[in-house]
Curated annotation (Swiss-Prot):
Belongs to the dystrophin family. Dystrobrevin subfamily. It is found in: Cytoplasm; Synapse; Cell membrane. It is linked to Left ventricular non-compaction 1: A form of left ventricular non-compaction, a cardiomyopathy due to myocardial morphogenesis arrest and characterized by a hypertrophic left ventricle, a severely thickened 2-layered myocardium, numerous prominent trabeculations, deep intertrabecular recesses, and poor systolic function. Clinical manifestations are variable. Some affected individuals experience no symptoms at all, others develop heart failure. In some cases, left ventricular non-compaction is associated with other congenital heart anomalies. LVNC1 is an autosomal dominant condition. Myopathy with myalgia, increased serum creatine kinase, and with or without episodic rhabdomyolysis 2: An autosomal dominant muscular disorder characterized by myalgia, muscle cramps and exercise intolerance with variable ages of onset, and persistent elevations of serum creatine kinase levels. Muscle biopsy shows mixed myopathic and dystrophic findings, characterized by fiber size variability, internalized nuclei, and slightly increased extracellular connective tissue and inflammation. Residues 400-450 are annotated as: Syntrophin-binding region. PANTHER family: DYSTROBREVIN ALPHA, E3 UBIQUITIN-PROTEIN LIGASE KCMF1. Residues 1-288 are annotated as: Interaction with MAGEE1. GO terms for molecular function: PDZ domain binding; zinc ion binding. The coiled coil domain mediates the interaction with dystrophin, alpha-catulin and utrophin. The gene is DTNA. One of its GO terms (cellular component) is nucleoplasm. Pfam families: EF-hand_2 (PF09068), EF-hand_3 (PF09069), ZZ (PF00569). InterPro entries: Distrobrevin, EF-hand-dom_pair, EF-hand_dom_typ1, EF-hand_dom_typ2, KCMF1/Dystrophin, Znf_ZZ, Znf_ZZ_sf. This is Dystrobrevin alpha. The modification Phosphoserine is found at residue 662.
Length: 743
C-alpha cells in the first residue's frame, strides 16, 4: 500500500510538472482554438520525444509486444503499457547517434503519465488496446497519410470498407487527446461527430477516408490533426520578411499575408495572438504560407509552369485499390531468425504499401505438378525420422510446413549450425540427408536450364508495361494539375499587378511613401494656386493699362487732332509686375481681379460667378489676346484720317467696337504717344509744359522723326506684350490642367 501510494504520488507530480511546463509556454493566449490545440499537442509530442518515432516503429513495437493479436477492447495494465513504451524508446535510442541520445526513462514516464491522464482519468490503471494504438498513431511522427492508413486498417473490415461503429470508437478515443490539454469545449466528443464526417448510407473505402480527412478543410472535429503535422513541417522554415506588427526582420514557421491590406504580413506569434496594427483588422482574411520564394523564383516558376502546359498541383495521396491485398503466406518462409507472431486480420490490412511483386518470399501461383506432389508427400513422410533427436517437436502442422523443400533445407542448415556432431550419429541418416540435398540441387539445376513457358516469360514484360502505363498516366495527371496551378498563379499575379498599379485611398493611407507624395502634391497645388493668383493680378494690371489706352483713343477721337499731349493722361502706363499681396491672397474671384478696370473691359471679361477659376482665366486670356491683336493692327494700319472707317470696321470685329474710336489724324495720335515717352515722364513739370508749348504745327517736321521711332518702339513693345500674354496663357492652361489632375 505504501509503495502504491508513493508511485501514485510520483505520477501525479510528474503530470503536474508536464502541464506546468505547458502553461509556461503561454499557449493559452493563442486566439484560435485550432492552433492552440495543435500547439499544445505538439509540445507534448516533443516533450515525450515522440516526434522522433514514426508509425512504422510504433507498429513494430506493438508486434514485438504481441498487441496485434489481442482484441481491440482488451485492457492493458500499467506495467504492460510501460513495457510497450520501453520497447519504443529503447529501439529509438539504438537508431539515434551517440551524440543525440535521449533520456529514455524520462520519456517513458512523461508519456505514460499523459496517456493515463487522457484515457484513465478515474485512476483504474487500465487502458484498452485500441486506445493505446490510436494515441500512439496520432502522437508519433511521420506522414499523416501513413498514420491514417494504419488507423483505417483498425476500423475497417476484411473487404476494405469502413465500419461506422469502429470509426465512432476511434473519434471517442482520439478526441480525448484535446480534452487532456484542456481543449475539450472546442474539440470534445459528441454524438454528432461521426455523422458530421461521413454519411452512413455510403460505403467508405481507404481512398474516400483519406480524401475526407486530408481535405482542406478537414472535418471540424479533427481540424487540429492536419495542423499538427503542418506545424512539424514548418518549424524550421525561414522567411526573410519583416513582420508588420512586431517589426522583426525575419520569421520562422508560418507566415500570414492579409488579402485586403497592401503588403501587410504577420509572423505566426502575432497572428495567433490577434495582434493588428494600422488599418489592419483581425476580421480581414489572411493567407497562410509554409515556405518562402523570392520574386525571381516566383517568376521563374510561373514561366516554367506556363511553358510546361501542365499543373503542378499534386493529388493529396496516391490511389489505392479498393480491395485490400491478401496477406502473405508466411508458412513457406525460411525462418532462420527467431520466429515472430503472425499478424492479425486488421494488421494485415495495412499491407497496401507492401509491393507483392518485389517480395522474395511469395509462393508459386502455378499449380504443382503430379511429380512434385508425390515428392512432397515423400518428404513429409520422411520428416519425422529426419527431425527425430534434433530438438524439434513434430506435429501435423509442422509436417504441412515441411511440405516445401525450402523449409527442409532451412531446418537442415540450422541443425548443422547448432549441433555439428549430429552428422556422426548414423550413416543411414547422413546418406538420407545427402540424397535429399542432391535431389533438391538436381531439380534446381533442371529448372534453371529448362526454358520458361511463354506465359511465364511474358509475365515480367506485362507487369513492366502495366507499370510504365501507370507511370505515364500519373505523369499526365501531374502535368495537368501543374497547368491548372500555373494558370491560377498567372491570374493572381495579374491581379496583384493591377492592384499595385492602381492603389486605393485606403492603401495610400497605410503607406508612408504614398502619404509623403500626397503631401508634396498638395503643396505643389497650393504653389500653383498662388502662381495663378499672381498671374491674375498681373493680368489685371495689364487690363488697367489697356483701359487707359482705350480712354486715350476715345479722348483723341472726341477732341482736336492737334491738341497738346500735355492735356492727356500724363501718368505712365505701369508695367506688369508680381504683386506681393497677390501671393498672400492665393484665391479670389474673377470679379475681384477686374477691380479698378473700366466698364468696357469689365463687360468684355465678366464671367459668371459659378464658373471655376480655370475657365475665368482662360476666357480672360483669350479676350486680352484678341484686344491686343486688334490694337497692334490698329497702330500698323493708321496712315491718315481716311483710314478712320477701316479702323472702325476692324474694331467692330472685336468685343470693344463701341468703346475704341479711331484718332482723327495720325499726327495727333503720334503726339499723344510722344507725350507718354519715358523721357517726358521722368522730366519735371516745367519741362513738360515747355515741351507742350513748343509742340505746334511748325515744329512738326522736327518732331516727326522722333515720333516715328517711338511709334515703332511702341509697336514692338505691344508685340512683345502680346507674345508674353500668349506664353502666360499657355503656361496657365498647362498648370491648371495639372492641378485638375492632381486634385
Amino acid at each position: 500500500m505504501i509503495e502504491d501510494s508513493g508511485k501514485r504520488g510520483n505520477t501525479m507530480a510528474e503530470r503536474r510538472q508536464l502541464f506546468a511546463e505547458m502553461r509556461a509556454q503561454d499557449l493559452d493566449r493563442i486566439r484560435l482554438s485550432t492552433y492552440r490545440t495543435a500547439c499544445k499537442l505538439r509540445f507534448v509530442q516533443k516533450k515525450c520525444n515522440l516526434h522522433l518515432v514514426d508509425i512504422w516503429n510504433v507498429i513494430e513495437a506493438l508486434r514485438e509486444n504481441a498487441l496485434n493479436n489481442l482484441d481491440p477492447n482488451t485492457e492493458l495494465n500499467v506495467s504492460r503499457l510501460e513495457a510497450v513504451l520501453s520497447t519504443i524508446f529503447y529501439q529509438l535510442n539504438k537508431r539515434m547517434p551517440t551524440t543525440h541520445q535521449i533520456h529514455v526513462e524520462q520519456s517513458i514516464s512523461l508519456l505514460l503519465n499523459f496517456l493515463l491522464a487522457a484515457f484513465d482519468p478515474e485512476g483504474h490503471g487500465k487502458i484498452s488496446v485500441f486506445a493505446v494504438k490510436m494515441a500512439l498513431a496520432t502522437l508519433c511522427g511521420g506522414k499523416i497519410m501513413d498514420k491514417l492508413r494504419y488507423i483505417f486498417s483498425m476500423i475497417s473490415d476484411s473487404s476494405g470498407v469502413m465500419v461506422y461503429g469502429r470509426y465512432d470508437q476511434f473519434l471517442r478515443e482520439v478526441l480525448k487527446l484535446p480534452t487532456a490539454v484542456f481543449e475539450g469545449p472546442s474539440f470534445g466528443y459528441t454524438e454528432q461527430s461521426a455523422r458530421s464526417c461521413f454519411s452512413q448510407q455510403k460505403k467508405v473505402t481507404l481512398n474516400g477516408f483519406l480524401d475526407t480527412l486530408m481535405s482542406d478543410p478537414p472535418p471540424q472535429c479533427l481540424v487540429w490533426l492536419p495542423l499538427l503535422h503542418r506545424l512539424a513541417n514548418v518549424e524550421n522554415v525561414f522567411h526573410p520578411v519583416e513582420c508588420s506588427y512586431c517589426h522583426s526582420e525575419s520569421m520562422m514557421g508560418f507566415r500570414y499575408r492579409c488579402q485586403q491590406c497592401h503588403n501587410y504580413q504577420l509572423c505566426q506569434d502575432c497572428f495567433w495572438r490577434g495582434h493588428a496594427g494600422g488599418s489592419h483588422s483581425n476580421q480581414h482574411q489572411m493567407k497562410e504560407y509554409t515556405s518562402w520564394k523570392s520574386p525571381a523564383k516566383k517568376l521563374t516558376n510561373a514561366l516554367s509552369k506556363s511553358l510546361s502546359c501542365a499543373s503542378s498541383r499534386e493529388p493529396l495521396h496516391p490511389m489505392f485499390p479498393d480491395q485490400p491485398e491478401k496477406p502473405l503466406n508466411l508458412a513457406h518462409i525460411v525462418d532462420t531468425w527467431p520466429p515472430r507472431p503472425v499478424t492479425s486480420m486488421n494488421d494485415t490490412l495495412f499491407s497496401h504499401s507492401v509491393p507483392s511483386s518485389g517480395s522474395p518470399f511469395i509462393t508459386r501461383s502455378s499449380p504443382p505438378k503430379d511429380s512434385e506432389v508425390e515428392q512432397n508427400k515423400l518428404l513429409a513422410r520422411a520428416a519425422p525420422a529426419f527431425l527425430k533427436g534434433k530438438g524439434i517437436q513434430y506435429s501435423l502442422n509442422v509436417a504441412d510446413r515441411l511440405a516445401d523443400e525450402h523449409v527442409l533445407i532451412g531446418l537442415y542448415v540450422n541443425m548443422l549450425r547448432n549441433n555439428p556432431s549430429c552428422m556422426l550419429e548414423s550413416s543411414n541418416r547422413l546418406d538420407e540427408e545427402h540424397r535429399l540435398i542432391a535431389r533438391y540441387a538436381a531439380r534446381l539445376a533442371a529448372e534453371s536450364s529448362s526454358s520458361q513457358p511463354p506465359q511465364q516469360r511474358s509475365a515480367p514484360d506485362i507487369s513492366f508495361t502495366i507499370d510504365a502505363n501507370k507511370q505515364q498516366r500519373q505523369l499526365i495527371a501531374e502535368l495537368e494539375n501543374k497547368n491548372r496551378e500555373i494558370l491560377q498563379e498567372i491570374q493572381r499575379l495579374r491581379l496583384e499587378h493591377e492592384q499595385a498599379s492602381q492603389p486605393t485611398p485606403e492603401k495610400a493611407q497605410q503607406n508612408p511613401t504614398l502619404l509623403a507624395e500626397l503631401r508634396l502634391l498638395r503643396q505643389r497645388k497650393d504653389e500653383l494656386e498662388q502662381r495663378m493668383s499672381a498671374l491674375q493680378e498681373s493680368r489685371r494690371e495689364l487690363m488697367v493699362q489697356l483701359e487707359g489706352l482705350m480712354k486715350l483713343l476715345k479722348t483723341q477721337g472726341a477732341g482736336s487732332p492737334r491738341s497738346s499731349p500735355s492735356h492727356t493722361i500724363s501718368r505712365p502706363i505701369p508695367m506688369p509686375i508680381r504683386s506681393a499681396s497677390a501671393c498672400s491672397t492665393p484665391t479670389h474671384t474673377p470679379q475681384d481681379s477686374l477691380t479698378g478696370v473700366g466698364g468696357d473691359v469689365q463687360e468684355a471679361f465678366a464671367q459668371s460667378s459659378r464658373r471655376n477659376l480655370r475657365n475665368d482665366l482662360l476666357v480672360a486670356a483669350d479676350s486680352i489676346t484678341n484686344t491686343m491683336s486688334s490694337l497692334v493692327k490698329e497702330l500698323n494700319s493708321e496712315v491718315g484720317s481716311e483710314t478712320e472707317s477701316n479702323v472702325d470696321s476692324e474694331f467692330a470685329r472685336t468685343q470693344f467696337e463701341d468703346l475704341v474710336p479711331s484718332p482723327t489724324s495720325e499726327k495727333a495720335f503720334l503726339a499723344q504717344i510722344h507725350a507718354r515717352k519715358p523721357g517726358y515722364i521722368h522730366s519735371g513739370a516745367t519741362t513738360s509744359t515747355m515741351r507742350g508749348d513748343m509742340v505746334t504745327e511748325d515744329a512738326d517736321p522736327y518732331v516727326q522723326p522722333e515720333d516715328e521711332n517711338y511709334e515703332n518702339d511702341s509697336v514692338r513693345q505691344l508685340e512683345n506684350e502680346l507674345q508674353m500674354e500668349e506664353y502666360l496663357k499657355q503656361k496657365l492652361q498647362d498648370e491648371a490642367y495639372q492641378v485638375s489632375l492632381q486634385g
